[in-house]
Amino acid sequence: MSNFAVSLPEVIAVLPAAGIGSRMLADCPKQYLTVGGKTIIEHAIFSLLHHPRIQRVIVVIHPQDTQFSRLSVAQDPRISTVYGGDQRANSVMAGLQLAGQAEWVLVHDAARPCLHLDDLSRLLSITECSQVGGILAAPVRDTMKRAEPGIQAIAHTVDRQDLWHALTPQLFPLELLKLCLSRALREGVAVTDEASALEYCGYHPILVTGRSDNIKVTRPEDLALAEFYLTQRQSLNNDSL
């Protein structure tokens, strides 16, 4: 392990992967679909394990999952698994219980196979300057429309000046994230990402600019796009050798 990794706070990663991904219309959960020669979840895990500051990855799986244990990455000693819950917040909380005494926890979507190492490094660097944490995010470039309630018609255009697409990973002090998620769950607040729980509790995580090709595979057409990005990256890596 490098001196760089030892001198900075310990970071544990949690990868919620207990969902079934019904919008993909596939025969298996989307994280087990193959893209670029590996399953989506393998790409997501390897992008974390390749960084020297990530000590361990906790993969949160569905109680009836029989596929993760068959992957070669499941045998890596830095990988732990735990069963998740019905909602993302419950699954993340289950993962946090295995994080031990780590100072910081990084949560990454199992369905994001295109994370760049330099984006991850920029996010991890905030442990040196923030006590709240932050997320990878991309500024909104498209024109945004708000729909009329209940119908698919434009109500008005939304000012995109300060709008960002929330991405993952998202990085927070372990105990702070536990506290905020616990409160949100206890009070019945719907949180769609970990930053939402901190926002609910009055905190303001940092926005760290990330690449917009860090896509989440949600629909069938996303597979081809992820394949393109991964192939392009591999081609660039080969050209640099």
Curated annotation (Swiss-Prot):
Pathway it works in: Isoprenoid biosynthesis; isopentenyl diphosphate biosynthesis via DXP pathway; isopentenyl diphosphate from 1-deoxy-D-xylulose 5-phosphate: step 2/6
Keywords, in A-Z order: Isoprene biosynthesis, Nucleotidyltransferase, Transferase
Name assigned to this protein: 2-C-methyl-D-erythritol 4-phosphate cytidylyltransferase
Chain coiled-coil ranges: none
Uppermost EC category: transferase
Subunit architecture: Homodimer.
InterPro entries (alphabetical): IspD (IPR001228), IspD/TarI (IPR034683), IspD/TarI_cytidylyltransf_bact (IPR050088), ISPD_synthase_CS (IPR018294), Nucleotide-diphossugar_trans (IPR029044)
Disulfide bonds: none
Entry function: Catalyzes the formation of 4-diphosphocytidyl-2-C-methyl-D-erythritol from CTP and 2-C-methyl-D-erythritol 4-phosphate (MEP).
Reaction catalysis annotation: 2-C-methyl-D-erythritol 4-phosphate + CTP + H(+) = 4-CDP-2-C-methyl-D-erythritol + diphosphate
Site feature Positions MEP for the nucleophilic attack, where: R160, K216
Biological process terms in GO annotation: isopentenyl diphosphate biosynthetic process, methylerythritol 4-phosphate pathway
Site (Transition state stabilizer): R23, K30
Family matches, as Gene3D superfamilies: Spore Coat Polysaccharide Biosynthesis Protein SpsA, Chain A
Enzyme Commission number(s) of this protein: 2.7.7.60
Organism: Yersinia pseudotuberculosis serotype I (strain IP32953)
Top-level lineage group: Bacteria
GO molecular function, one term: 2-C-methyl-D-erythritol 4-phosphate cytidylyltransferase activity
Family stated for the protein in its record: Belongs to the IspD/TarI cytidylyltransferase family. IspD subfamily.
